[in-house]
Amino acid sequence: MKNTLLTKTSQLCICAVMLAMTIGAAQRSFSQERKAINLATARGLPFSDGIVVGNTLYVAGQEGTDDAGKLAAGGIGPETTATLENIQKVLKAAGFDLKDVVSVTVYLADIHEFPDMNKVYKSVMPDPKPARATIQAAALVNNARIEISAIAVKQK
């Protein structure tokens, strides 16, 4: 009986310690500070160009616009180039680089422009290429042909 009581007490103590460790780890991860990255590309809109949490940067959808909001002229190629340049601006402002990008979502107004977009994308993004999804969107803000969002992770 004494051994059983001791075993149950030991088990309870171990569980309590493990629970405290789990709660502590969860609190540390949830209490990480969020740092907003705001460039001219947001132009007063109700979102940040990026949010850094810990060693991860979440880049909001970027389009191929200049600081005044004007789309790059010349079709999907120049617009893709300008979009990727805007992503690089957000990355740089947060202390990240294209090599830190691990995931990308591409929104195209016309999926038939996929091959032309891909040529530019392939020439700009370093190897290994990030995971990527490409989606056709019915319409994009500013009548853009492309919008790209990204997630970057800085190696510790």
Feature names for model-found ranges:
Residues 1-7:
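N-terminal secretory signal peptides that target proteins for export/translocation
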Residues 8-85, 89-102, 108-156:
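N-terminal presequence-like segments and the immediate start of the first folded domain
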